[in-house]
Amino acid sequence: MRFSVFTAAIAAAFSACCATASPAVNYVNSLILQRADPHIVKHTDGWYYFTATVPEYDRIVLRRAQTIQGLQSAPETVIWRRKAFGVGSGQVWAPELHYIDGRWYIYVALGVSGQWRIRAFVLEGVGANPLTASWTEKGIIQTNWDTFSLDATTFVANGTRYLVWAQQDPSRNGENSSLFIAPLQNPWTIRGPAVAISHPDLSWERIGYKVNEGPAVIQRNGRIFLTYSASATDHNYCMGLLTARADANLMNPASWVKSQQPIFVSNAATNQWGPGHNQFTVSEDGLSDILVYHDRGYRDINGDPLNDPNRRTRVQKLYWRDDGTPDFGIPVPDGPTPVRLRVAANGASSNGAYVRFYTTTGSGNLTGTAALPDTQFKLVSPGLSGGDSVSLESTSNPGTYVRRVSGSTAVQFERGTALNTAALRASASFRRVPGLSDSGGAVSFESVESPGQYLRLDPNGRLSVASVAEGTQGRSTFYLE
């Protein structure tokens, strides 16, 4: 099938005001199979540490590696196992690893065998490496009520360390969990009564179960962004967002503004279902924020989703909008993480522009701002022509590739199934070479079909494949973000 597209358009100009560009990241999804509720932290020793829920719900595991991708094959160490009776003899859910004042702490939800009695619990580890540390139990976190509680996380704002967690609010009949916050006296004891900052009161938070859970915090641009997950743990599972000013009174529920729509949901096109229970980490170079989450690679589940073992850990780059807010985009397809291609050239039609997927017929209307997924592409290597070629596959429309129209400089998007001859595959294949205007930090894409011609932005702001005139190399040069 050929899309009704004559050109690939360019997204609206990128503003350097608040959204800072950072290099592309290179990971392969899924990162770790059968590991839900993932938590990855980069410690000051340069190592990445990983923990997550295992399908048996019977132990706490840790991994470490010097890269995020390295966690995939890193050996796993069991640092705590389910007990025979009492607290910790039931479910073992959603551990998180934190380093506080020279010691390691794991926040985890523990149950009691034969009872639906799940509470947030803390372990303390002494030692430089948490995989070999000496671990002791600090006990259940005592809150306002002795009710179902889980998913504790911690962060520091304005010199105060806070705990945020999910708990059943006894004043709200029929709801499973709300989000609460309190300052910490020490890593296992809250100070003063907690306050609720979010209840599952929106329709998308109440599908299957009425849930707000899995809080995670990232602080940027003078604001505190708190993500959480909602609804049942099947394909309806999704993520919401609370936002507060960094200088706000975080114990005042009015300081937290809830987004009225979910910010990260299932995507049929990319075949990613039930994304959620996220955390944040940073790339190896420290320049990009990384979204860590779980989902499944299929929609339909037989029986209770909690009995399905195939939630898996995934990672992708978190982008930032001009206004300083996070743009989560969509759960990207399996395989290499996609990139954005920012044009290097200066000028009104090109400065800071991104290549985008475009479906409107005509010559390429450049008005409006492209959705993030439409500006993301997987650099498929080897490309459709094989060898050292690469092909640019759309993230928002997987299986669709950038190709040169035969006998023309124009570019269109074509389904890979229609590229069924060597010549057609060559029209959608390029050789990645050092950037023509910046060979140190950028790339250019030379046509396999027409060597010496390059993917480029023409003077009208349209993407084309053509020869490059002296002084216009920047229009054929792209920064990968």
From Swiss-Prot:
<keyword id="KW-0964">Secreted</keyword>
<keyword id="KW-0325">Glycoprotein</keyword>
<feature type="signal peptide">
    <location>
        <begin position="1"/>
        <end position="19"/>
    </location>
</feature>
<dbReference type="Pfam" id="PF04616">
    <property type="entry name" value="Glyco_hydro_43"/>
</dbReference>
<keyword id="KW-0378">Hydrolase</keyword>
<dbReference type="GO" id="GO:0046373">
    <property type="term" value="P:L-arabinose metabolic process"/>
</dbReference>
<feature type="glycosylation site" description="N-linked (GlcNAc...) asparagine">
    <location>
        <position position="365"/>
    </location>
</feature>
<dbReference type="InterPro" id="IPR006710">
    <property type="entry name" value="Glyco_hydro_43"/>
</dbReference>
<comment type="function">
    <text>Alpha-L-arabinofuranosidase specific for the cleavage of alpha-1,3-linkage. Shows high activity against 4-nitrophenyl alpha-L-arabinofuranoside, debranched arabinan, and sugar beet arabinan.</text>
</comment>
<keyword id="KW-0732">Signal</keyword>
<keyword id="KW-0326">Glycosidase</keyword>
<dbReference type="InterPro" id="IPR023296">
    <property type="entry name" value="Glyco_hydro_beta-prop_sf"/>
</dbReference>
<feature type="glycosylation site" description="N-linked (GlcNAc...) asparagine">
    <location>
        <position position="176"/>
    </location>
</feature>
<feature type="glycosylation site" description="N-linked (GlcNAc...) asparagine">
    <location>
        <position position="158"/>
    </location>
</feature>
<dbReference type="Pfam" id="PF05270">
    <property type="entry name" value="AbfB"/>
</dbReference>
<comment type="similarity">
    <text>Belongs to the glycosyl hydrolase 43 family.</text>
</comment>
<dbReference type="InterPro" id="IPR036195">
    <property type="entry name" value="AbfB_ABD_sf"/>
</dbReference>
<feature type="site" description="Important for catalytic activity, responsible for pKa modulation of the active site Glu and correct orientation of both the proton donor and substrate">
    <location>
        <position position="151"/>
    </location>
</feature>
<dbReference type="InterPro" id="IPR007934">
    <property type="entry name" value="AbfB_ABD"/>
</dbReference>
<dbReference type="GO" id="GO:0005576">
    <property type="term" value="C:extracellular region"/>
</dbReference>
<dbReference type="GO" id="GO:0046556">
    <property type="term" value="F:alpha-L-arabinofuranosidase activity"/>
</dbReference>
<protein>
    <recommendedName>
        <fullName>Alpha-L-arabinofuranosidase 43</fullName>
        <ecNumber>3.2.1.55</ecNumber>
    </recommendedName>
</protein>
